[in-house]
Amino acid sequence: MGGGLSTLEQKLTEMITAPVEALGYELVGIEFIRGRTSTLRIYIDSEDGINVDDCADVSHQVSAVLDVEDPISVAYNLEVSSPGLDRPMFTADHYARFQGEEVALVLRMAVQNRRKWQGIIKAVDGEMITVTVEGKDEVFALSNIQKANLVPHF
């Protein structure tokens, strides 16, 4: 998540984008989490928001595609959900869309001896984002972002 999708995640994204969009939803992103029981998590959104029926419709459609294509060699659970208040960020477009909002980042490789950063999204330039952290601008490569989420404020 955040940038630098795995080869499997790229392949899955290519396979399921069209079916998700055909149902009228935006494919926000996907995560494939390997474990004893692996999980394929799909995040969807729409202008009207997402409810349980929307998730069920997408799950049914995506399951049919995955059953035919069979891209995942291990047993897994399929989860479809809205991005929620702490919306995950996957693409440069997501960062641009939420410019001015607060984001929490976990990096693949430390920058200045830190892997965790939190600040305001200031700018997006190609595959680089600028985040203002404690009054100072820090630049991160999307490919170095392991996980990124908006920080909700109540």
From Swiss-Prot:
Cited Pfam families: DUF150_C (PF17384), RimP_N (PF02576)
GO BP terms in the entry: ribosomal small subunit assembly; translation
Subcellular location field: Cytoplasm
Assigned keywords, A-Z: Cytoplasm, Ribosome biogenesis
Coiled coil (residue ranges): none
GO CC, alphabetical: cytosol
Main location: cytoplasm
InterPro entries: Ribosome_maturation_RimP, RimP_C, RimP_C_sf, RimP_N, RimP_N_sf
CDD domains linked: YlxS_C
NCBIfam families xrefs: PRK00092.1-1
Free-text function comment from the UniProt entry: Required for maturation of 30S ribosomal subunits.
Assigned protein family: Belongs to the RimP family.
Protein name: Ribosome maturation factor RimP
